Amino acid sequence: MGWNEAIKLRSASLPALCLLYVTCALDASGAASYAKEAVITETAGTVRIAADSPRPLEQVLNALQSKYGWIVNYEDPQYVSAVDVIKASSDSQVPSGGSFTFEFSSAAPDEGKTLRQLVDTYNKSKNPGHFELRHTADGGFNVVGTAGHSDKGEIVEQQAPFDLALTLSNKEQTIDETVTRICAEVSRQSRSNVVLAISPRKILFQNRVALGGNKVAARELLSKSLGATHGKIYWRLLFDPESKNYYLNLHLVHGV
């Protein structure tokens, strides 16, 4: 998929993206079926985070960010099996996540150890997808979906879209254009379109970056692009079982 096609798909996909977010909070009758955010409690030296979401692992990461300020990028695997998908309303499908509880010691928790424990605990649960915790060059962390169920109910390894090695000519563009170009190249090489959806548009349009590389991981190129904003931006790469598209949401951390 070329850059121009990526722009068109991005515009056409926004209504579907809005619908995706609305239906994630509804059941077939239109009543709320998931928690808006995870519930955090702390008793007897133990922190307990109770999530209830189509993507409970992401919801726990959001809770950890709220409590400790840990900024962690999150990437869905592909949810393509009936085992990993449920109907949230009469005409939409979402990942078949639900309740998930994570507990850890409240005594000066270490970010890396806690995140490792979280991912390991999640992978042992019955919720959809399997994930890996990845360290970044700047000391941060990515939680990356690496497997999902097949139609036979078996766990099957998947290639994460941002693991793809890209070759891009060095070109100075706005950061919005650069991220869109990265998404377009990932889409061209993979089986799913990757669309830049939610983002701090003003910052991405006002800042420019000269970026390219030969066989560089898409995730690294994305991280360098966002770093050129001189702000703290993290991402959520969400797979929509309905359209089979990935939606890249970028969020600005305020006050950092």
Where are these regions (language model features)?
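N-terminal targeting/assembly segments of extracytoplasmic apparatus and virion spike/baseplate proteins
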Residues: 1-256
